[in-house]
């Protein structure tokens, strides 16, 4: 008699084993019984994280009962469907090498997924038939992605297919969501991020609505620059009429986003960007709001994300106004009367009259010529921005000049906007030989390199190199929705390697966020990430050639990403010694010197690193998001897959070591909403290490960002967390970040309670109480 025993799936230290006689149940009853057990175990997660592990394994078991037992069979069943998404070429490769793939794939690795991970895979990544029935297992999806990367070209590279499968299935790396759910299909749009620049003519305005919709339908997130659109009531010489400005156009894109969801798997996602000198800036800042005059009149567009492209000049004027050194006067323009302000930037931040400050020069030239259409103050703009941030958490802030002056591709053109999450910064333009920016993303699991004797920087370097090669192949194998996206990606070959699990690293090694050791390690980890990517990109250039826009790039002159920071005065030259010390000699001055010399000969990719939010990737692997601290030690995570209790297992393990994980502590943790700061029975040293993102001084997040940013080719999705919506606190970190040379000022500003947060009741089946829940914003 077959008996299903929970004790064989996970240790149950708090309850007795539950045995179910499967022979006496129908398939429907088995499914129902398993689902009951999964829900029951999930509700008990507050007692111990092993219950969540148990629920995850039950969920995997349930999936395995309804899916094919071999990879080739899963592909065959999908290919036989009348509306199969799989490409014939992919199916042919699988059939040809099915003996290798079937024998290599390890379905037991599915049981390593967290509950949040397996449910995310089921709902977002695993291919389904037309009736919504899941047709593959997580391991099948990983193999599908690996074959897409290394099996769809002229040569089927079995060795790299199996290596990539191992890296994915062992959760050492993750690829972006579009890659996961489009790999191997007839229309494999594998890229995550697209950047569009909207021109000020009717044809292009509507072209960009169409282009954005097509991209969104394939799973891509979109960033649009609106700074070139003439302001409201501007004269249109061709028709003799007046312009509607950006408001109606934003509403049009808002409607398009709602319609063109990402392949039916998640809502469409657009971000619109505007520079602060634009006459319509106050309209722009009000459009995201859920309350206010525009919202009441339904003239808002709350489904979009918003971003500000902020020049140094504005920050200088704002700082002077804050400290009563100036009146804060800020001039507003319409781009038809004051052209090209969004196409120039300040190469230097110096106040010297001979400094290379093209934006400042042109701005004041237009002021002198009285081309401005309005006058306000820097404070008024910031107050309007903050009023919106309190409601919805954005607009984001990107520091325009820092982004451009520290770009390896600054010779290509001015970067006018970013993407959905403000970590991708690729030049884009419309018109003759238009280029629409594209970036392919992946992330490395930093926790995978924790060792008993410290941290494995060599392993991280190697993994970063492997991801670099993966992403470079994706550029060649992917589908492009427009010729302008293909042209841009082939010319610059940008990739964006991010990270997740930094908080897991610090917790495992008992290092406190904000400590000198943590900041040094943050710097060293991202130095290793960048080094590994650059080294492999140089090797690929020797084999396949450099990206076409390599001549004139910073790398072609022997300048690495941190060198651009040194040149700007935002990084001291002794950084190499510091990294050498932290990595214990893995990366030395000689390492970087050799890398510079090699880069001059050629680099395959124009960009290498970009630190994205990694919400879904982190969910699927059970690690903390990107480079962030823990948002709470106990909360409910709301995703497209449902709601899941998340318990900080590192805290539990530390408390168990000193016999403090008791029912009394559990209740206090619940009542405190996941905080341990006022649980005085817990030693101060542990309380200090497990401060959540809201509980630590936000300057700590800025200092960490400043440590890692010199090794980021593009930018980062930098969040801040505040208890109260106080403008002075937010301005403190924004100004500090700007002075430290950060490329991103802010992604989301979270307030408690505020945008993206809620109170959620969690407890076992008998009792419940409140705890904070950090909802996924992507």
Curated annotation (Swiss-Prot):
Its EC number is 1.17.4.1. The record marks 193, 439 as: Important for hydrogen atom transfer. InterPro entries: NrdE_NrdA_C, RNR_lg_C, RNR_lsu_N, RNR_R1-su_N, Rrm1. Under complex allosteric control mediated by deoxynucleoside triphosphates and ATP binding. The type of nucleotide bound at the specificity site determines substrate preference. It seems probable that ATP makes the enzyme reduce CDP and UDP, dGTP favors ADP reduction and dTTP favors GDP reduction. Disulfide bonds join 193-439. The active site is at residues 419, 421, 423. The record marks 747-748 as: Important for electron transfer. GO terms for molecular function: ATP binding; ribonucleoside-diphosphate reductase activity, thioredoxin disulfide as acceptor. Pfam families: Ribonuc_red_lgC (PF02867), Ribonuc_red_lgN (PF00317). The record marks 773, 776 as: Interacts with thioredoxin/glutaredoxin. It catalyses: a 2'-deoxyribonucleoside 5'-diphosphate + [thioredoxin]-disulfide + H2O = a ribonucleoside 5'-diphosphate + [thioredoxin]-dithiol. Substrate binds at residues 177, 192-193, 221, 419-423, 613-617. The record marks 200, 230 as: Allosteric effector binding. One of its GO terms (biological process) is deoxyribonucleotide biosynthetic process. PANTHER family: RIBONUCLEOSIDE-DIPHOSPHATE REDUCTASE LARGE CHAIN, RIBONUCLEOSIDE-DIPHOSPHATE REDUCTASE LARGE SUBUNIT. Ribonucleoside-diphosphate reductase holoenzyme provides the precursors necessary for viral DNA synthesis. Allows virus growth in non-dividing cells. Catalyzes the biosynthesis of deoxyribonucleotides from the corresponding ribonucleotides. Heterotetramer composed of a homodimer of the large subunit (R1) and a homodimer of the small subunit (R2). Larger multisubunit protein complex are also active, composed of (R1)n(R2)n. This is Ribonucleoside-diphosphate reductase large subunit. It comes from African swine fever virus (isolate Warthog/Namibia/Wart80/1980) (ASFV).
